Design a protein with these regions (language model features):
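Sec-dependent signal peptide recognition
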Residues: 7, 23-31
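Short hydrophobic targeting helices and cationic amphipathic motifs
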Residues: 4-7, 11-14
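Bacterial Sec-dependent signal peptides at the C-terminal "C-region" and cleavage site
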Residues: 35-45
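Secretory-pathway ectodomains
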Residues: 44-234
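Short, linear, compositionally biased motifs with a strong N-terminal bias
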Residues: 13, 31-32
């Protein structure tokens, strides 16, 4: 074997060893990256947006630690029975005198006021990205609003309940495109069409506060002052 062949063989082995080392290093870095990613995923926690009648603030808390991470003060008389985080991270809430959309820096994006004799009680995000607002009164009014605050539709409905505060809190829209209106004073949930016509009335025990659609086609109905939760075919 010549000296040239000898040194060429050594260099070839060195290149192979170098590639093996680089491969091991690459594998290690990938493993470390996956570990960091997994660890980061483990640290992700659910947040809860909380508000309620008689409380002077809206807060976001960490579900695990129970620590308040954000809060927005409410003025005296601002009864907040409906608050929700929008897909873009803003906060939409009803406060009796109207409904506001604010950002996390507490800056008002828009405000829709309710008439003096009415109370805005519903502020929800719809599956299509628009918002559902509703105020109690004579008549009660249901509105669909764009994220920019543009009123897209307006439905009026007379509940037959004299005192507006005894009408409803949280409206929802069902898969048929109608509105579910849980009424306190009459202890029933009414399905109202966008034209303001009654489609169906479901009578319940208790004071229905809100509804939530289930995968099986039924709905949860939470009864506020009735302190109960029931599954109902609405």
């Amino acid at each position: 074997m010549s000296h040239l062949e000898y040194f060429t063989g050594i260099l070839a082995h060195l290149q192979i060893d170098k590639l093996l080392v680089m491969h091991k290093l690459f594998t290690y870095l990938c493993s470390a990256l996956l570990l960091v990613t997994a660890t980061s995923c483990e640290k992700k926690t659910e947040k809860l947006l909380l508000g309620g009648s008689g409380w002077n603030k809206i807060v976001i808390i960490d579900k695990n630690t129970k620590q308040v991470e954000w809060e927005h003060p409410l003025e005296k008389g601002w009864e907040c029975n409906s608050a929700v985080a929008t897909p873009d991270g803003n906060i939409l809430f009803a406060y009796a005198r109207g409904a506001k959309l604010i950002d996390r820096n507490h800056q008002e994006i828009w405000n829709i006021a309710a008439p003096d004799t009415c109370e805005m009680q519903t502020a929800r995000v719809l599956p299509d990205g628009n918002y559902l607002l509703g105020w109690v009164g004579h008549p009660a009014v249901i509105m669909e609003v764009s994220p920019k605050g543009e009123i897209l539709s307006r439905t009026e409905y007379e509940t037959g309940i004299e005192h507006p505060h005894a009408q409803f809190r949280q409206l929802n829209k069902n898969a048929r495109g109608n509105y579910l209106m849980p009424l306190f004073a009459t202890s029933d949930v009414r399905e109202i069409s966008p034209r303001g016509e009654v489609v169906k009335i479901t009578r319940l025990e208790g004071t229905p506060f809100t509804t939530l659609a289930l995968a099986n086609g039924n709905h949860w109905v939470a009864c506020g002052d009735g302190h109960s939760l029931m599954e109902v075919n609405l």
